[in-house]
Amino acid sequence: MKAAEIREKFLKFFESKGHTIVRSSSLVPGNDPTLLFTNSGMVQFKDVFLGAETRPYSRATTAQRSVRAGGKHNDLENVGYTARHHTFFEMLGNFSFGDYFKRDAIHYAWELLTSVYKLPADKLWVTVYHDDDEAYDIWAKEVGVPAERIIRIGDNKGARYASDNFWQMGDTGPCGPCSEIFYDHGPDVWGGPPGSPEEDGDRYIEIWNLVFMQFNRDAQGNMTRLPKPCVDTGMGLERIAAVLQHVHSNYEIDLFQQLIKASARETGVADLANNSLKVIADHIRACSFLIVDGVIPGNEGRGYVLRRIVRRAIRHGYKLGRKAPFFHKLVADLVAEMGAAYPELKEAEPRVTDVLRQEEERFFETIEHGMSILEAALAELDAAGGKTLDGELAFKLHDTYGFPLDLTADVCRERGVTVDEPAFDDAMARQREQARAAGKFKATQGLEYTGAKTTFHGYEEIAFDDAKVVALYVEGASVGEVKAGESAVVVLDHTPFYAESGGQVGDQGVLANAATRFAVGDTLKVQADVIGHHGELEQGTLKVGDVVRAEIDAARRARTARNHSATHLMHKALRDVLGSHVQQKGSLVDADKTRFDFAHNAPLTDDEIRRVEAIVNEQVLANAPGIVRVMPYDDAVKGGAMALFGEKYGDEVRVLDLGFSRELCGGTHVHRTGDIGLFKIVAEGGVAAGIRRVEAITGDNAVRYVQALDARVNAAAAALKAQPSELLQRIGQVQDQVKSLEKELGALKSRLASSQGDELAQQAVEVGGVHVLAATLDGADAKTLRETVDKLKDKLKSAAIVLAAVDGGKVSLIAGVTADASKKVKAGELVNFVAQQVGGKGGGRPDMAQAGGTEPAKLPAALAGVKGWVEARL
């Protein structure tokens, strides 16, 4: 039974039992930014189990795409070296949300395995939690599993409920016992049943885990029964396929065999049992589906994990002798195997292929150098009898050549060598400290503040009359007063000043009363809820306890708000134009512009930029209101608000609806989209692999920018004596004229060179039957020099010629040697002889070569030496 049929039979079986088939969710968890990747079937139902979400069904079944690489669940190191570890796998599951419980879950599992998949009942063993008598009795008395094949597993991990057979979502929350089903491969395979000292052998293989969520665990560890217990089961498709196809390794199933054969084809390897082929076959699945779900290779977070997987696959191909990009070519083979089950893979095939190709090309630019350094170090280590690679070298490979530590460790492991990871960590820590020291210094860093939080009024007000000074800092130290001319940080109990956060710069403005004026140059966070006003006291003395009027620069705030709101609209427009893989990777919003970094693997075309601008300006013209709501985080995400991975959100979040955009945001914004005025993209480029940057301006800045463009167009039109509307046509005419004149000039140079060539032929000196000529051809370019040399060779019949020209301090050289003389006099050697004397070098064929130089003053002497150089070789 093929893997595709196994998947289909599983889903159809549970559909026949009243389950709704739910499509696989994304590998990027949409409801949990703290989770790196979707790693099990229950992830998309987490809020349902917690009671925070309801679905229109109480029974569900899925084939969930899952990844375990990076973070807590990381199988990367073992992939390719064991029979059952993968970075990507499919988890088949059935779920009950307060519907059926243990009895039905157990009977369903047994019926599917024995009646649908036709597994022999006497090959199946089960485990239960040691005091779960209910599950034990169902297996023994209802299903009929003999007692010797039902094993009770206790708390085998050092604490109460710490057991292979007790599942918990976290330290608190839903939890409960589980029952695992094992397949016995028979006595010919080493290993013992679960719970025995030999349980790690390959004879008894876990194929299905049935989790019974029946308790809620509180912070004190107390267990209370859930009013509606739930069921969460998981069976790895690859594992059950290995059992049903009578093989002992997941890599021997049909799905993997096709990918392994494709990997062998691309690497030129005949041995299909090679572990490196298994690595490549596994990794193409993980990499392709991660890219399908919007992850782009990068240097942090999910992107960094993807980059590590890609580079590990490339390194294994390199190890097999494949020294050029090959990995991306396997996408088509993966689509052939899995495209029917996952149409999104087939749809994204061109983009996935392109992303992988670009990543391969980047890595191959550095891999050879890095590998040569590592190989040399390992050879030296082996000669010295060492078994530990220097951590500093491992860090250099990581930092300079893009080798992740685990890739270096992989190479070392094959040689029986370990990496000094503590030394690597020390080097990494030093670099981070240096980066911090070199980074922008924040005036609020290191301030010790223990008072009350600041109340922020900036969403509603631009000034606050009765703000009280609660703390003052000068050069990082807490002080009681600040004198005129001193720079300081002021903390108020109330403020309208927005502190730099979420990419938006802090406000500027003034703190003042009748006797004091403090100019605020920046506003920063001292702590999460404490705002510091950094600036200089221009007048008077400011003391703790003073009351001031806090007033922001309203015009600057308004320009910043326009740019911030435009960023939200641009983000949505980019996703509409380029695809849902576009995700914000960074931003800077100030009064002059917005700078937006996002995941995308290709430069934006002019048409794409125009479309983004048109969409944003359409939203501006709609003059839609900005609607702000504060709500629970879960409600916001369920309502479609974008939550960005890596951002920290509290239980309550601020949601901004602006036109067609909905995002979580704590920044300041316009009241209506029309307040943005005009939106214009002024720059687009790449900042890192897979990361693009767009800069845009709004409002009066955009108007001035367009006016300046208009002025330049008018000036250019006037200079070319044309109307602005005729400018492109006029430029085309001028270009045609230039081409015509250049052609005429070339013809003149050719005629001049021809006439000079006739004169030069008379200067040739015969040496040993060969005419030797070394001369300067005034005003000639490289093309003219070559043509003249060819004509002289024809004219002189047997010759060795060097012609030179000087233009703008640079020397051009062409050497030509006729066929009869080129056995002894090589044109490449001849031109190099001259070039080396004029500060250059060159080379070419024995009959024709060229070179250049930077010291024209030495040219006469160099040419004078040609006769003697040729004579010495004849």
Swiss-Prot record:
InterPro entries: aa-tRNA-synth_II/BPL/LPL (IPR045864), Ala-tRNA-lgiase_IIc (IPR002318), Ala-tRNA-ligase_IIc_anticod-bd (IPR018162), Ala-tRNA-synth_IIc_core (IPR018165), Ala-tRNA-synth_IIc_N (IPR018164), Ala-tRNA_ligase (IPR050058), Ala_tRNA_ligase_euk/bac (IPR023033), DHHA1_dom (IPR003156). SUPFAM superfamilies: Class II aaRS and biotin synthetases (SSF55681), Putative anticodon-binding domain of alanyl-tRNA synthetase (AlaRS) (SSF101353), ThrRS/AlaRS common domain (SSF55186), Translation proteins (SSF50447). It catalyses: tRNA(Ala) + L-alanine + ATP = L-alanyl-tRNA(Ala) + AMP + diphosphate. It comes from the Bacteria. GO terms for cellular component: cytosol. Its cofactor is Zn(2+). Disulfide bonds: none annotated. This is Alanine--tRNA ligase. It comes from Burkholderia pseudomallei (strain 668). The lineage of its organism: Bacteria, Pseudomonadati, Pseudomonadota, Betaproteobacteria, Burkholderiales.
